[in-house]
Amino acid sequence: MLKTVQQKLHHHTRPLLAWLKLLWRRIDEDHMTTLAGNLAYVSLLSLVPLIAVVFALFAAFPMFSEVSVQIRHFIFANFIPATGDVIQGYIEQFVANSSRMTAVGAFGLIVTSLLLMYSIDSALNTIWRSTRSRPKVYSFAVYWMILTLGPLLAGASLAISSYLLSLRWASDLDGVIDNLLRLFPLILSWAAFWLLYSIVPTTQVRNRDAVIGALVAALLFEAGKKAFALYITTFPSYQLIYGVISVVPILFVWVYWTWCIVLLGAEITVTLGEYRKLKTEETEQP
């Protein structure tokens, strides 16, 4: 009886171990942590320009003036742990200064924002090992669409949600709404990662693999956010060493950790398809 259970356990764990071994090999071969470091560096250079462009778009549409404040609070409360208020203050100051830029300066902000999107595109296609490239005009159109329509769609979604919550019948669903609001950051991360893994690679990605990889990345992101916030508040070594400028290394570490999670989700998505392909080739061999 015990031997039978052990055999069944071995039968089920062997494919998992083989897949984990394949995942580890791909992470090593793709230099995932180095890619994450490159993206973290570009992200810090592009962070203020990207936010400046996004909120400039909101300013161009008066109906989104109140929604932009809600989105700003939501982003810093749910996606930047522990020091979100401090970072938000600095970034809002930088954005206010950028509003006084000339046309040439504004063009530079847009180019820097597009540079981040190009770096993400390049890193993900490196992981997928895709040699096919999109036409430059098409890539620029996609990046520009994400940069302009993405924030507006998010604003419209939040505006509709706020309107529905203000309706009288919604008061009877307070408990359900509270639970949904707690899950909303996870659902939003899951959807964003799924779109990232499905659309950005220039090769075909199976939808199921992208959903699984995105779910793992979203769960790790939420867990990592709480763990990072706990570490910063429990072991305030950065504040003791760096003092007032401690927010800079804290932000860099968090951005680097975030990109490690994003790229790990991409590696999981790729490995699921590669492992399935290897198993198919094994069964077809005589």
UniProtKB/Swiss-Prot annotation:
InterPro entries, sorted: UPF0761_bac, Virul_fac_BrkB
Transmembrane parts of this sequence: 44-64, 74-94, 104-124, 140-160, 183-203, 210-230, 244-264
Tagged with keyword Transmembrane helix: yes
Superkingdom, taxonomy of origin: Bacteria
One Pfam family matching this protein: Virul_fac_BrkB
Record's subcellular location: Cell inner membrane
Membrane topology, as annotated: Multi-pass membrane protein
GO cellular component: plasma membrane
Keyword Metal-binding on entry: no
Predominant localisation class: membrane
Keywords: Cell inner membrane, Cell membrane, Membrane, Transmembrane, Transmembrane helix
NCBIfam families listed in its UniProt record: PRK01637.1, yihY_not_rbn
Family as reported in the entry's similarity comment: Belongs to the UPF0761 family.
PANTHER family, sorted: INNER MEMBRANE PROTEIN YHJD, UPF0761 MEMBRANE PROTEIN YIHY
Protein name in UniProt: UPF0761 membrane protein KPK_5501
Protein's organism: Klebsiella pneumoniae (strain 342)
